[in-house]
């Protein structure tokens, strides 16, 4: 830098392009500056020159201050021309502040759309990050997180288990391998086989699993990446997609899609497809999608991976649905996708898909329905006469894509989901192609290259084995159990209440307001001691059970209601006891901490 001489400085009123560019390069040599900031800085220079050329000077204005910091040799601390070396730091600081202001401009403009809770969360996240940067405070925070981490490890890592960290020199005997695995699996299968797990295992009957395992074994070595070797796997995938599309009112509409590894990949693919569609057809390079706060976290992951701005709208605190009026206010020229859930994972409520699709259609953007949880439940519930609050699938004009998990209520093996699109032209944007590769033409429809053909074959076998009537009968039983649980919580169990108006198989409950409040996570912990594994939720603090086919077995729902009633009564009694100490084990302290902190810091510090 000492050998760099800036170009001579002409009068401010008569700048030249070589002078401007030369001075900018000399002052920023060796540094990297975002292109847009550099362009804006040059624009400031010429706007300032134009304004001063013949009329009103900009003395004292923000524009002049920025211009002086960036170009004229003045710094934040002195108002006279100095050498390059003495102004380099000041000028870099000025440009950095300018760039940070530009980066924050969008967030600042969005504040007017945010609720007080969202503003408080954002402020809390920023404050927590600043405080955590202080060494003394950072040490205290890390100490507390270390305590919780050790508790989680103790809960998940059972003592006495042999841990293998290197490949054994000599292989084990076949029987020894199977015996060892059978021992561990036997200990872990008991809980879900008794129907005491929320979600997780959706069918589980031995006869059904036997057929799926047989189908998988036949295609255990197959790979859909090589359709010339295993053309039957390609056939199975096409038929699974077609049957799923038909179930969701897309059979005669040209709806198409593919099989992915799960709901998260289906969602990532849908976002990626709409991003590419918007970029190629509408020229959008800074895309945004609009989701509810109850939308699955896979949309957060998709936006982080794909560099898409996520506009998250707080769901209605009573209905837990996405408000279409709020969506309208958040639309912009960069909106590429609106997302609705049918149902959402936390409270099991269904967003107003028809209203959201109309907004998307008028705005010219995509509309994705996340039906990962309800894809093989809602169509049959509708057929059975249950009120779902409106249509939710490709029967709604404006819906451009859907995600539907076959490994949930499609009762297939874990690792399969279906992503569907309104047309082949839209699906085309999902594909990745690279014809210039030296290894030959490379084209993959999903994120993965190689996929397990055995899983696709097992999915096809599941759908063919159950048939339409089999799925309908399963949904009839599931909806009956869910309805019983909802009615019992609403009418008979005092101390808790339903969240929203769940229309399908997810039932969430929170605690009633009372002089001495109950911790809902204490109820969850008490249920865990009785062998139940429920899902703890937050914002608001609540718990849900996702009813599956296993819960329809004789006596399961009766046991659940009896245990839940007993645990709620015990939690109320503990809350009313002034001498009772709060629990230090289980989910209660962990989620209590989560509720008191903004979302970002906990995610970044506790779980990474």
Predicted regions and their residues:
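Non-catalytic terminal extensions of PLP-dependent enzymes
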Residues: 2-234, 238-242, 246, 472, ...
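PLP-dependent aminotransferase-like
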Residues: 278-333
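Active-site phosphate-binding strand-loop segment of PLP-dependent enzymes
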Residues: 320-369
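Active-site C-terminal subdomain of aminotransferase-like
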Residues: 380-516, 597-600
């Amino acid at each position: 830098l000492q050998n760099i001489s800036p170009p001579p400085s002409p009068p401010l009123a008569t700048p030249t392009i070589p002078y401007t560019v030369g001075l900018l390069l000399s002052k920023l040599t060796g540094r990297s500056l975002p292109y847009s900031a550099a362009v804006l800085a040059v624009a400031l220079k010429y706007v300032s020159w134009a304004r001063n050329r013949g009329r009103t000077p900009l003395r004292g204005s923000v524009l002049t201050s920025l211009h002086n910091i960036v170009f004229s040799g003045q710094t934040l601390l002195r108002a006279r021309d100095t050498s390059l070396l003495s102004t380099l730091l000041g000028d870099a600081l000025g440009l950095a502040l300018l760039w940070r202001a530009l980066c924050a401009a969008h967030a600042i403009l969005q504040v007017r759309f945010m609720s007080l809770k969202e503003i408080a969360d954002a402020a809390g996240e920023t404050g927590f990050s600043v405080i955590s940067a202080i060494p003394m405070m950072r040490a205290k925070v890390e100490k507390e997180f270390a305590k919780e981490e050790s508790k989680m490890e103790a809960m998940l890592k059972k003592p006495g288990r042999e841990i293998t960290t290197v490949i054994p020199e000599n292989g084990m005997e076949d029987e020894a391998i199977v015996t060892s695995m059978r021992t561990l699996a036997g200990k872990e299968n008991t809980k879900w086989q008794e129907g005491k797990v929320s979600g997780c295992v959706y069918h589980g009957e031995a006869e059904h699993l036997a057929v799926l395992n047989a189908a998988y074994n036949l295609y255990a070595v197959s790979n859909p990446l090589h359709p010339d070797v295993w053309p039957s796997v390609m056939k199975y995938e096409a038929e699974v997609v077609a049957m799923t599309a038909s179930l969701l009112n897309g059979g005669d509409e040209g709806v198409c899609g593919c099989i992915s590894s799960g709901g998260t990949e289906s969602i990532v693919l849908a976002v990626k497809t709409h991003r590419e569609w918007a970029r190629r057809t509408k020229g959008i390079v800074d895309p945004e999608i609009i989701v509810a706060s109850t939308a699955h976290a896979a949309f957060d992951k998709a936006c982080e991976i794909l560099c898409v701005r996520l506009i998250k709208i707080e769901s209605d605190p009573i209905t837990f649905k996405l408000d279409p009026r709020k969506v309208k206010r958040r639309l912009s020229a960069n909106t590429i996708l609106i997302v609705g859930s049918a149902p959402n994972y936390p409270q099991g409520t269904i967003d107003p898909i028809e209203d959201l699709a109309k907004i998307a259609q008028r705005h010219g953007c995509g509309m994705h329905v996340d039906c990962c949880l309800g894809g093989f439940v809602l169509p049959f519930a509708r057929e059975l006469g249950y009120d779902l609050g409106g249509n939710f699938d490709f029967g709604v004009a404006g819906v451009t894509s859907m995600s539907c998990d076959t490994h949930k209520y499609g009762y297939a093996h874990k690792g399969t989901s279906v992503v569907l699109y309104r047309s082949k032209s839209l699906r085309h944007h999902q594909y990745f192609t690279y014809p210039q590769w030296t290894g030959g033409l490379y084209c993959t429809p999903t994120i993965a290259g190689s996929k397990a053909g055995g899983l696709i074959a097992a999915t096809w076998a599941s759908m063919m084995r159950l048939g339409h009537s089999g799925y309908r009968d399963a949904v009839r039983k599931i909806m009956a159990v869910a309805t019983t649980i909802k009615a019992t919580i609403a009418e008979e169990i005092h101390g808790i209440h339903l969240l929203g108006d769940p229309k399908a198989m997810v039932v969430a409950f929170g605690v009633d307001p009372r002089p001495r409040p109950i911790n809902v996570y204490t109820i969850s912990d008490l249920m865990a001691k009785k062998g139940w594994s429920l899902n703890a939720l937050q914002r608001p603090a609540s718990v849900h059970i996702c009813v599956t086919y296993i819960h329809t077995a004789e006596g399961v729902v009766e046991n659940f209601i009896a245990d839940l009633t007993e645990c709620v009564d015990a939690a109320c009694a503990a809350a009313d006891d002034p001498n009772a100490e709060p629990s230090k084990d289980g989910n209660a302290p962990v989620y209590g901490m989560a509720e008191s902190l903004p979302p970002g810091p906990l995610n970044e510090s506790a779980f990474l």
